Swiss-Prot record:
This is U15-lycotoxin-Ls1g. Disulfide bonds join C24-C54, C32-C58, C41-C53, C42-C80, C47-C62. The keyword Glycosyltransferase does not apply. GO terms for molecular function: toxin activity. InterPro entries: Elafin-like_sf. Residues 1-20 form the signal peptide.
Length: 86
């Protein structure tokens, strides 16, 4: 009996961990002209209010996490600069 209760609790714990994952939202834009590409952020620390720095075809923008995968976190790095990327 105790092992069944333990198994159920373990399963519920694992399920809650999986369901609580958050991701960058999927971008609705598939392409962007080079002259319109800009980065508002390069890393999560550039964002405020619990938002993340997410990569889109038009640059990096601060977005609130979504429950479904599909988007991509910005890679950042030394070559990343904020502003327009010509």
């Amino acid at each position: 009996m105790n092992s069944k209760i333990f198994a159920v609790l373990l399963l519920l714990g694992l399920l809650s961990c999986v369901l609580s994952d958050q991701y960058c939202p999927k971008s609705s834009i598939t392409a962007c002209k080079k002259m319109n590409i800009r980065n508002d952020c390069c890393k999560d620390d550039d964002c405020t209010g619990g938002s993340w720095c997410c990569a889109t075809p038009c640059g990096n923008f601060c977005k609130y996490p979504a429950d479904r995968p599909g988007g991509k976190r910005a890679a950042g790095g030394k070559s990343c600069k904020t502003g327009y990327v010509y």
